Amino acid sequence: MAAPRVTLDTDMPRSVAVTYDYLCPFARNAHEAVVAALRDGSDLEVRFVPFSLEQAHVEEGQPPVWETPVEQLRRGVRALSYGLAVRDEFPESFFDFHLAAFAARHDHGQKFETDVLDDVVASVGLDVEAVRKVVETGRPLEALAAEHTEAVDRWSVFGVPTFIDGDEAVFIRFMERGRVDDLERALDLLGWNRLNEFKRTTIPR
């Protein structure tokens, strides 16, 4: 007896959330594709969700990274705090900041000290003092705490980038940067929950 033909539902979701941490090159690959798709006119609604890899490696019983005073933040958390300040208070500049922050780390090898992030802010035409004031309010850290915690508690997120569609959450590694076609193919598969893991045994060089 022939096996039943498998037909995939290739209707892409119309609304997704996607996690990020500026420290991760694979998050960069995915987010460049997401931003490119949106700038090309995609009607996909995207919620950009911060997820701290530094928090994910905090030992049990230790205080969470967002409880550190603003001036003593770990570098990755500091970058997320700046990104959230821009996302929530200067949304028209978020895409530019988002891509520039990834570039600062992964093209130029910069560590996310305050002066580096100030330069990223200035490079996208934002007022450095205005963004810094938002960071200093602590609101971005509150947003990070809430959104990271929800990602872990509700969807069991463990890394970036994770794409979330309804109750489904899938960790995806794109090997190339900014490929909208790769993004579309991955989004097509989000709802196919009978495929749980599909991992290559070697990394293409």
Question: Could you say what each language-model-derived stretch is?
Answer:
Residues 28-115, 186-189, 193, 197-201, ...:
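Structural alpha/beta surface segment adjacent to cysteine/selenocysteine redox centers
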Residues 21, 69, 73, 134, ...:
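Charge-dense, low-complexity intrinsically disordered segments
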Residues 6-34:
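Local sequence-structure signature of Cys/Sec-based thiol-disulfide redox active-site neighborhoods
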Residues 17-19, 49, 164:
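Solvent-exposed beta-strand sheet faces enriched in polar/charged residues
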Residues 31-39, 108-205:
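C-terminal cap of thioredoxin/glutaredoxin-like
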